[in-house]
Each structure stands twice: as C-alpha cells, then as structure tokens.
UniProtKB/Swiss-Prot annotation:
Chain residues that bind orotate: 120, 148
E.C. no: 2.4.2.10
Described purpose of this protein according to its UniProt entry: Catalyzes the transfer of a ribosyl phosphate group from 5-phosphoribose 1-diphosphate to orotate, leading to the formation of orotidine monophosphate (OMP).
Gene Ontology terms, MF aspect: magnesium ion binding; orotate phosphoribosyltransferase activity
Coiled-coil intervals, chain numbering: none
Organism: Brucella abortus (strain 2308)
Protein's name according to its UniProt entry: Orotate phosphoribosyltransferase
Pathway in which this enzyme or protein is active: Pyrimidine metabolism; UMP biosynthesis via de novo pathway; UMP from orotate: step 1/2
Keywords on record: Glycosyltransferase, Magnesium, Pyrimidine biosynthesis, Transferase
NCBIfam families cross-referenced by the UniProt entry: pyrE_Therm
Catalysed reaction equations from the record: orotidine 5'-phosphate + diphosphate = orotate + 5-phospho-alpha-D-ribose 1-diphosphate
SUPFAM superfamilies linked to this entry: PRTase-like
Family under the similarity heading: Belongs to the purine/pyrimidine phosphoribosyltransferase family. PyrE subfamily.
Cofactor: Mg(2+)
Amino acid sequence: MNTDDVLAVFREAGAILEGHFILTSGLRSPVFLQKARVFMHADKTEKLCKALAEKIRAADLGPIDYVVGPAIGGLIPSYETSRHLGVPSVWVERENGVFRLRRFDVPKGARVVIVEDIVTTGLSIRETIDCMKDLGIEVVAAACIVDRSAGKADVGTRLISLAEYEVPAYPADKLPPELAAIPAVKPGSRNI
C-alpha cells in the first residue's frame, strides 16, 4: 500500500477536509485529515492497519512485545495494528497534561512500537517515548498511518509511515492571506 492508496481510503471516507484548521500541534492548515471518518469503518481501518503491520514487520525490528498508542488519536490504529502483529495493545493517556501508562503493567525491558494515527510535529510520539523511558521500556520504533511532515518531523525514534503526505502548516501569526480570510475550526483531540 502506498501513499496514493492510503489517500484513496481517506477520500472514500470523506476524510480529507479543506478549510482553515487548527491542528492538534497548534499549527494552522488548509487541509485536515479527519481520521475518525476512516476509523468509523472497520473494513477501512483493518485495511490500513494490516498494511501498517506488514510495513512494521518488513522493517526487521526484532521481537516486539507490545504496541503502544497515545490516547486519543492512537487508540484505534494501535489496537488494530497490534491485532495484525499478534501482540498486546496498551495505551498512554494524559494525567495532568503528561502521558502515563495507567491501566497496564508492561515489564521493564519490554520492546514496544508506538503506533499513532497522523504525525505532524511528532510531539505525541516524543511524549510517549519519554513515558516509556521513565518505565524502563525500550521503544524500537514508531509508526503512523499518515506522516503529514513527509519525513521532516523529529519523533525521537525511527518512524515507519504508511503514507507521507506533506500538507502546509503555519504558525498562527504567519498565515497566508487566503487562509487568514477563512474562520478557523479546531477538530483535533489534544485537549480532550
């Protein structure tokens, strides 16, 4: 599965939106990938996550003990990808603004892959890595359905992406006039 195939799945689901969006990262963009419209369809989710699992396997990372997903956006893709890898899925969630592994016991030294939905700046993955390091858990790689940065985001580890789709993103004070003229909406989940 390549970038065009992934974007075709997003288009079929009506998940590529155009307008003025405030991304989870705080950056502004004329395009928003509304992955919830994809993930509401089990067949589309399975197709994408099975392909991501195959790409993770092909990366020859050695044994993987767990897949870790940052809540909220990483929950569905991490679970479905773990199913195809045949390993347990756990997740981190925010507690006082910091990712914590609250509901699971993952042993020190466990080897994990972090699976995220969409990467723009890599912040959620970096924060998940910090949480894992604090627990003595080894992050062998991160993976995502779509890398909006096209490989430019520093996620703090190797990033395996099913699709690279570079979409412009701007700080709020550096918007092009055509984007500034459109009212902004914030569809992300960072502060939920």
